[in-house]
């Protein structure tokens, strides 16, 4: 359903070029009695340009993708890359996630890098949802901008903002992402999930 009675909009998204996505998971399918999962929101970048592109010091070859967001991981409140695909593949997590995607120009990679430089950690008031929606809006422009109500940004509010668009994808495939790493204070560290 379209927000506020307006017709739902379709974002241009060809299966070529650079594809930016914002994905949100409300946590409901992973919540249990007395244990609420609040969900997660992240950004994805899919390279289908025919050549390698670079995001910070990461080469993203044609046909590969990268995901990124800030996390509230104990001792590591920095910017983590490709953690979400590992959770999806190894643990079956984030089922029911919703994604919105659009094409961007390669010049927009600089906008993403600048945003990452200025906003490289999770905080209570600037959580993963806040971080992701503000990055998305900085890159895509007014026509594709997501609008939320209130001051606190949550996956649920991002899902509500998605209702303005008719091109929302369920359980987007992130299997072409690479290994997990993080940036904290400008330094890159390779990571692995515990088995």
Where are these regions (language model features)?
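Non-catalytic ligand/cofactor/substrate-binding and regulatory segments of enzyme domains
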Residues: 2-126, 138, 158-195
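Surface-exposed patches in mature extracellular/periplasmic domains of secreted proteins
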Residues: 119-128, 141-153
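PAPS/PAP-binding and catalytic site of the sulfotransferase fold
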Residues: 131-136
